[in-house]
């Protein structure tokens, strides 16, 4: 086997790049998680079945477009998300704003998902065997297992996902089939559903669930060999798995009132399969949270580049401790606020690379200090999207537009380059 991956922020060399199929599995692993089923449930409760499926799928399609747009930057440069920000934000801006926010966000989500998994594991074990495993113990054990995959790196994530995604698909399909058998199809006819959400709100909700992932896409696409491979791995990784999970969430909610496949399996009398589904779906997503957190911690704390493993370990342990102390129940609100702060970062990266730098890797110029155009665009994007629009991902568009205006007054290093070469 290969040794654990060491580097964090240096460009990934040509010989370390991977084929698109292995990264499609990693992308799929990120998409299948309890929140993805929850998305289906929220849509199912707010609209009839077809609008729910179509609006949710459309949201995922926008996610794919966004991920391809940021992912190609990661692939062109071979750089992680926070490093891709060094042009639009400047090196200090990327360090103090971007990597700090990303790290907090990822560590928080690692802890929250770990808590969901730990609690469900303890409940299921109690129901199945009568053993009362304290939730703190479950959290810690599973947290460490999920964390070690991330410490090992993308190679381990890819191994995990190649085994677990097919297994999860089989369990999910079987669970849905059983739900039909147990509950019948009577509840699918939508007579009782009052449409309480507009179609476009459904699309927005679906995008919001993965908005942050759209922007941290380069953490994985930097391992791709070409733009074409990036499109393939993102599309085939995100879209089918996202939509299947969404549809199952919708159908299960309509049938049984319970959206989480693992809970449905426990209710129809297959708790063991339920636990496996829960653990795998959390593991494949959560390892990537810890992995991305580690990359950002390296930048935020200005660690040596070969300290990625230690940084990942620290991030995960902080997440597990926060989870065990029960702090995370109080900060879910804070984390949803964070997506307002993360989204405009995407707008700045996209504007600097695709418009100012004309989409060419040779024009990408990390600049020392702070690029105020990026910081202003980011801050205004976050404030406007939070106060006026109240839709997180609009921050991407606002950040993008304001950066292009601000950059006219505070030219980016990427522009001088694009002009000199042209």
Predicted regions and their residues:
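Membrane-interface "cap" regions at the ends of multi-pass membrane proteins
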Residues: 1-50, 63, 197-203, 222-229, ...
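Hydrophobic, membrane-embedded alpha-helices of multi-pass small-molecule transporters
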Residues: 20-36, 177-182, 190-252, 268-287, ...
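Transmembrane alpha-helical segments of multi-pass small-molecule transport proteins
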Residues: 26-29, 99-100, 126-152, 166-175, ...
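Extracellular loop-to-transmembrane helix junctions
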Residues: 42-71, 93-97, 238-239, 398
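Juxtamembrane transmembrane-helix boundary signature
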Residues: 57-89, 98-108, 112, 410-416
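Membrane-interface loop-to-helix entry segments
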Residues: 137, 141-142, 146-179, 193, ...
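Hydrophobic alpha-helical segments and their helix-loop junctions in multi-pass secondary transporters
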Residues: 150, 166-192, 206-210, 249-254, ...
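C-terminal membrane-solvent junction of multi-pass transporters and transport-like membrane proteins
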Residues: 309, 345-422
């Amino acid at each position: 086997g290969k040794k654990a991956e060491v580097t964090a922020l240096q460009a990934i060399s040509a010989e370390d790049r991977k084929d698109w199929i292995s990264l499609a599995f990693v992308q799929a692993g990120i998409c299948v998680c309890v929140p993805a089923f929850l998305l289906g449930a929220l849509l199912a409760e707010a609209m009839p079945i077809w609008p729910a499926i179509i609006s949710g799928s459309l949201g995922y399609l926008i996610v794919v477009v966004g991920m391809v747009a940021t992912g190609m930057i990661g692939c062109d440069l071979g750089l992680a998300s926070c490093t891709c920000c060094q042009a639009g934000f400047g090196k200090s801006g990327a360090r103090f704003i971007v990597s700090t926010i990303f790290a907090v966000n990822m560590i928080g989500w690692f802890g929250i998902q770990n808590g969901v998994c730990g609690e469900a594991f303890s409940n299921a074990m109690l129901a199945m065997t009568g053993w009362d495993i304290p939730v703190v113990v479950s959290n810690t054990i599973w947290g460490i297992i999920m964390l070690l995959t991330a410490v090992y790196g993308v190679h381990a994530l890819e191994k995990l996902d190649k085994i677990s995604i097919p297994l999860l698909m089989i369990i999910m399909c079987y669970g849905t089939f059983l739900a039909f058998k147990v509950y019948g199809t009577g509840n699918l006819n939508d007579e009782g559903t009052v449409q309480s959400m507009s179609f476009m709100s459904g699309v927005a909700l679906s995008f919001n669930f993965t908005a942050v992932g759209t922007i941290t896409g380069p953490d994985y696409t930097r391992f791709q060999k070409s733009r074409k491979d990036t499109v393939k791995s993102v599309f085939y990784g995100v879209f089918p798995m996202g939509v299947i999970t969404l549809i199952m969430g919708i159908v299960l909610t309509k049938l049984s009132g319970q959206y989480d496949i693992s809970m449905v399996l426990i209710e129809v009398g297959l708790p063991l399969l339920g636990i496996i589904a829960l653990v795998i779906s959390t593991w494949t997503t959560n390892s990537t949270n810890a992995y991305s957190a580690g990359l950002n911690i390296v930048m935020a704390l200005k660690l040596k580049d070969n300290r990625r493993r230690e940084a990942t370990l620290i991030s995960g342990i902080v997440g597990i401790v926060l989870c065990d102390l029960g702090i995370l129940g109080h900060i879910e609100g804070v984390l949803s606020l964070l997506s307002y702060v993360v989204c405009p970062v995407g707008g700045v990266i996209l504007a600097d690379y695709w418009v100012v730098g004309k989409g060419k890797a040779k024009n990408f110029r990390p600049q020392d200090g702070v690029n105020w155009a990026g910081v202003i665009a980011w801050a205004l994007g976050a404030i406007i999207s939070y106060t006026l629009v109240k839709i997180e991902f609009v921050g991407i568009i606002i950040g993008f537009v304001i950066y292009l205006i601000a950059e006219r007054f505070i030219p980016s290093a990427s522009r001088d380059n694009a002009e000199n070469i042209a």
